[in-house]
């Protein structure tokens, strides 16, 4: 059985048969406020607890709230949480590559969100931004396989004809072995997590979780 890193959220871990698979890329997408960053932070916390001599590389393109991080991390050792805040798509690629060369003990890589800078640069030069995006994403799966750690990427979404999907969806769906869609419900804080793609678990399976001040439960 493939090793998994649990989120400690019952609904999420139940849907994923124990957590996020190691050695693969998992994609989480959903509208703003569905819990993508909270899930990424909670998984980061658990990675630090499970592998205290390893580091978590967290690429932040959204302006992560340090207050939110403190809420979810609690007394967890943040010295093992290495945040990368690139200024552009090309900087993201270069900085991530540099960090990977500096650290050989990694428990998790997170990119939150992977398509933020691409949307901006795509408006200016579609050809260059698409090529840079493909170059960046193409290094993630080999890294996950070689390092035997999970890579979690979150994605911004668009809506067309009533359907919600991630920007640059075709590239991301080809890259990702697991694809998860987070959905808001009418009850405040209640979310659905829907499994859109998995190599061994039933697709379109759904579980519930609650987005709280302390993370996802």
List each model region and its residues.
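A conditional alpha-helix N-cap/helix-loop micro-motif detector
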Residues: 5-9, 37, 89, 133
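Pre-Walker A adenine-sensing motif
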Residues: 7-20
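Conserved P-loop
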Residues: 20-98
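Switch/connector loops and helix/strand junctions flanking conserved nucleotide-binding motifs
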Residues: 66-68, 92-93, 117-120, 161-163, ...
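P-loop NTPase motor core
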Residues: 86, 96-174
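Short, surface-exposed amphipathic charged segments that create phosphate/polyanion-binding patches used
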Residues: 94-102, 192-199
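Phosphate-binding/switch region of NTP-binding enzymes
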Residues: 143-217
């Amino acid at each position: 059985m493939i090793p998994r890193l649990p989120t400690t959220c019952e609904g999420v871990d139940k849907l994923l048969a124990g957590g996020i698979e190691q050695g693969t890329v998992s994609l989480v997408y959903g509208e703003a406020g569905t819990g993508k960053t909270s899930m990424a932070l909670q998984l980061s916390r658990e990675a630090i607890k499970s592998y205290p001599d390893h580091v978590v590389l967290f690429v932040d393109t959204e302006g992560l709230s340090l207050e939110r991080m403190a809420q979810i991390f609690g007394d967890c050792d943040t010295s093992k949480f290495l945040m990368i805040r690139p200024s552009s798509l090309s900087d993201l690629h270069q900085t991530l590559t540099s960090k990977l060369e500096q650290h050989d003990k990694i428990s998790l890589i997170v990119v939150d969100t992977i398509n933020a800078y691409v949307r901006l640069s795509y408006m200016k030069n579609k050809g260059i931004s698409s090529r840079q995006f493909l170059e960046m994403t193409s290094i993630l799966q080999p890294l996950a396989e070689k390092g035997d750690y999970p890579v979690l990427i979150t994605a911004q979404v668009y809506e067309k004809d009533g359907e919600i999907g991630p920007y640059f969806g075709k590239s991301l769906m080809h890259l990702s072995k697991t694809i998860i869609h987070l959905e808001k419900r009418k009850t405040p804080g209640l979310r659905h997590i829907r499994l859109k793609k998995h190599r061994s678990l039933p697709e379109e399976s759904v579980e519930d979780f609650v987005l709280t001040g302390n993370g996802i439960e």
